[in-house]
């Protein structure tokens, strides 16, 4: 089996998939490039919410923590425990990465249900959660792939590549393919679940009175949180796996 062309085709497929579009979209023309304005606008809003909330909560730490300080300390402790469980004792340097992934995805997912995006009128299309777009989920999955390769190479050097012939060299093609399919599974799982949730709510709102879809919206909030947790857990698990060198 020729592994290199297979790997190249997988990467090319991932690049092509990042151009998948659902519905109409609004673009900015910058030079010779078209920039996906909808995703950028909603992503900036999510980033502003995260930065603003963190700044307000911790700008003046108290000996007796305020409610906001308590909340952020709880979130940090949760992310540290998650990272330590999946990565091991060397989890420390990876807490910011895992935390950033979890918080951005969590707030992005919830923004699709809680923020009134539709009051902002665009020439084409409409605003929605950033994770409702395959371009965002691919952009989140690719740094995760780079992170676990970096973690493995930093910890084990070139010996990291020895894992591809474990437990037998016959599995070399499968082990290589597995690493290149991880970002595919991460991006499609997140994109598919968030898109499906928003579509279900839209359909129900259009078919039945506004009160009926409320339970579905609450279920969507729960599912959105679970999807953020799954993504962060898998990202940490992949990093821990690359550092330990076992499957």
Swiss-Prot record:
GO cellular component: chloroplast thylakoid membrane; plasma membrane; proton-transporting ATP synthase complex
Phylogenetic lineage: Eukaryota, Viridiplantae, Streptophyta, Embryophyta, Tracheophyta
Record's bilayer topology term: Multi-pass membrane protein
HAMAP family: ATP_synth_a_bact (MF_01393)
CDD domains named in the record: ATP-synt_Fo_a_6
Compartment(s): Plastid, Chloroplast thylakoid membrane
Subunit structure: F-type ATPases have 2 components, CF(1) - the catalytic core - and CF(0) - the membrane proton channel. CF(1) has five subunits: alpha(3), beta(3), gamma(1), delta(1), epsilon(1). CF(0) has four main subunits: a, b, b' and c.
Superkingdom of origin: Eukaryota
Identification of the protein by name: ATP synthase subunit a, chloroplastic
Membrane-crossing residue ranges in chain numbering: 38-58, 95-115, 134-154, 199-219, 220-240
NCBIfam families registered for this protein in UniProt: ATP_synt_6_or_A (TIGR01131)
Keywords in alphabetical order: ATP synthesis, CF(0), Chloroplast, Hydrogen ion transport, Ion transport, Membrane, Plastid, Thylakoid, Transmembrane, Transmembrane helix, Transport
Listed GO MF terms: proton-transporting ATP synthase activity, rotational mechanism
Keyword Lipoprotein recorded: no
Organism: Platanus occidentalis (Sycamore)
Main location group: plastid
Family: Belongs to the ATPase A chain family.
Known function: Key component of the proton channel; it plays a direct role in the translocation of protons across the membrane.
